[in-house]
Amino acid sequence: MTFISLRLPEMRSQGVFCVVLLLSLSSCASVPLHQGTSLGSYADMTASGGSLTKAKLRVDPAPVLAAQTVRIVRTSAQIGNSGAFDPKNLALVTNAIDRALCTGLSDRFQVVASNQPADLVVHATVTDIVPTNRTAAATSAVASLGTSVALAVPIPRIPIGLGGLSVEAEAVGLDGTQKAAMLWSRGANMLTTKARISTVGDAYSLSSAFGADFSRMLVKGQDPFKGTSMIPSAQKIKASLGGGPKYDACKAFGSAPGITGAVAGQLGLPPGWSDKGAATTQ
């Protein structure tokens, strides 16, 4: 009798975990690739991506790997429903992309200021944001706080109103021609994307994933979705925790929220509660 009473909670937790895993595999927002008008060329791009990400890309390895310096032009937005988002919240998303790009590119390139010449000039454009349903996000956040502690397993979000992000970006050389380009989209996942009570909550959370994928393509000079994963560098870990960036040019995008941001994310708070945004304007 004692044996049964000890094992039931464990079996219940294992059962819940299995259900969560099965749900997470099929329950994520579907965000199609949105081709905008910001790239110099959309030719010769090949389909790529991972289990959660859709992508089309092209990269010219020789000039990309030969490049030593890079300049980041602030991310812009060309979305049809821009009026549905507070400009301050939209700015947090675009700046989070810039911050992630700057941190990722710092692994191999010297990132220079906006008024300096560079071997590569990088510019990204948000082409679509699927808004997060704030009511559903709030319900998920409250439910997660209570049940995850009791069951000691991750609790999935409510599969309603999941948001998403679509971005396009390119790297242009000194001769003005495109050396690399990417179309990218990803939707929030029930299990891996924490609910934030904001219409841009999921887009903000996914922005760092785009920045990591695009910067990895330039650092490696190849498809970032192929090959082995890269171990985060010391400078990248430091920056993610809110520390100073490797290059002064990255200070323009402000510091990452770090541990405070992680706690805010667990509580479902909007991005603006912990992210102060860009440090300067350009």
Place the predicted regions along the sequence by residue.
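A structural "domain/chain start" motif
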Residues: 29-95, 219-282
